[in-house]
Amino acid sequence: GPLTEDMSMVERIEFVKGPAGFMLANGDPSGFYNVVTKKPSGRNKGEVGISMGSFDLYRANLDLDGKFSEDGKLLYRINVMGQLKGSHRQFDFNNRYSVVPVLKYLIDDKTSVTLEYTHQFSEVNVIGSNYIFSKKGYADLPRDFTTAEANLAPTKMNDRSLLVIFDHKLSNNWKITAQAAYFNYQQQGASLWPQWPVAFDPQNDSILYRGMSIWDVLGTSKIGQMFVNGEVQTGAVSHKILAGMDMSNKEYYHDWNQGGALGGEFNIYAPEYGNATQPVFDRTKSIRERGVRYYDGYTGLYVQDELGFFDDALRLTLAGRYTTLKTGDIYSGDFKSSRFTPRIGLSYSIDKNTAVYFVKDESFLENYGSDWQQKSFDPITGGNIEAGIKKDWVNGKWNSAVSVYQITRNNVLTADMDHPNPAGGYYSRQSGQQKTKGVEVDIRGQIVRGLDVIINYAYTEAKVTKDSEKGNIGTQVPGSSRHIQNAWLNYKIDMGALTGFGISAGYQYQVKRSPWFVFDGSENSLPDYFRLDGSLSYQKEKIGFNLVVNNILNKYLYSGAPYEDYFYWQTEPGTNMRFSVSYRF
């Protein structure tokens, strides 16, 4: 759903790239990540945790896992979380709770049905209150600055979903899986943004004119997937086959058509809160009556065969997907398009510790919205070419991976600077191509007993290669960084009086960062980014303690972009901490 999954319900997060990207999915050429939620394990166990921290953070979570029936056929798992959380920004908060019950029924030793329900609720300050605006440039105001007021009505979000999974083992080598999901998202709130077309007083850069508009949303999604996978042998060649179909239908209603000024003049350098008059919104009609309807959907057929040669030392993957996309709204009408996208991959195990691979993949994705003439946008097309090598060292204590890639995206949307949108900002236009070339290096291993390290480096050259505005060609793609380097050290004592004690530290370093959105032919690079974090932990049998400290150096960290004739950015908190206690039973 639109709300990010709370970590209390997450088992693990899988970052999918390289040969692993050959999955039954309508995916982006740059890869994707997969969130795996907690499922019943068949064991009776549980965990409870309590956290407190900076900015009035209070949080509790409960994880229960077990069997409903004595024969072990009916399993359950339930995760419950509640959180009250302030912010480093004035008047800002994020209060939320989630309830995630899961049932799994083992019909027999070959068949199972899983039913998962998720309800997440979030209450935050008015949307947009986390942005800072100034005509003088980035970091011109304190990181706790806000344009919001203390008495604004909160924005409330309810995100509900129901997932059903059916698994059946056809034989020892073949399996069929069917999944169906329904998502329902409801939001009632408002958005805070500078007024348009005049955000700042032309005679005084200190005076900002704030605007506030309604932002109510109703979204429903129906998603289905069915596939079969298995293995066969034809002579000396093995085959790992995956074939299936997936489809979705999504419908959204948005209301942002009511709004007005939030108070009068607002001095960003000497703000006075509590005197602003708020616009009043009319919600007597349902969101379906007053909102604008958008919909999109797709149907895809997919087949893949991984052929293994020389006892599977050499693996050739051939795959193809046929996708039909459909989108529509009252402005641009209905749009439908179909395309076949092939995939090919080759990997070879040089020895038991070393493997090389090559991947060529194409993509076909919907493009939402319309231009100033209400013409629908063509789908995004593109492709990924990637090659790499993976190797284990020192009997598996160290492993490394190096890859090079080029990602191409066509029909990219950019701002149409010739056609302002009366509702604010600019219309979009479809005129671009972006190419991203890069190198990624991942290293992890054990330095000495108990001391582990993870090191990542990524060099990314992301450029605009085609654009109707010639001045944009050759500029860095908005929102990208040329260099990103991370490292994380973790030391855990496993003997002696201090057994169970651990200490960790790590950093992230970004160089030559591009702003979120730049459309004027320049790059307007953001300053380099460096953040240092650390933690202390102690595990004693069933009870654990953990202290996390973020932004240890208390740096003013932010990201942003130029907009109209001013700048806007989001800040990260200064040094902050979180202390957690957990108990397993």
Q: Which role does the model predict for each range below?
A:
Residues 508-518, 537-585:
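C-terminal beta-signal and adjacent terminal beta-strands/loops
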Residues 8-11, 22-99, 107-111, 160, ...:
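Outer-membrane beta-barrel translocator/receptor signature
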